[in-house]
Amino acid sequence: MRLLIKQRVFSWTDTFDIYDETGNPKYFVKGELFSLGHRLHVYDASGQEIGLVRGKLALLPVFEIELHGAYLGRIEKRFTLFRPKYDLEYRGWRAEGDFLGWNYDVYEACCVAVHVTKEPFHWGDTYVIDFSNPADELPALLLVLAIDAANCSGS
């Protein structure tokens, strides 16, 4: 299964449109302009809020993710000199790869649960999330949004 994340270029806040593999709108994401810490609200196609990525005040970027109002997990950027690394607190998932180049995998045990790539030659950033388990769709989306927010935080 696949989701496409397209970032809107001319927007005051982080705004993303999310499409399914056939190109139909599935979700949209809207960031808060004035908030203490980074906040991204995820809505389904009918406009109901279904998820939240919330930045916590910390020395390095830390993000909590919520699904349908319930705590789902946490993503924390580790201190490294050259390449960013993240600690994930969700079902034993771990992320490896090139986060700044948007080519990374999320593993559950020894298997790839989610594969993330950046599509070249698009107006604005376009990311592709591939996953095999339909139950991983929203957790994977929230995780990718949190990693994007952590990369953009500049820490």
Regions found by a protein language model. Give the residues of each.
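Intrinsically disordered, low-complexity proline/glycine-rich segments
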Residues: 1-155
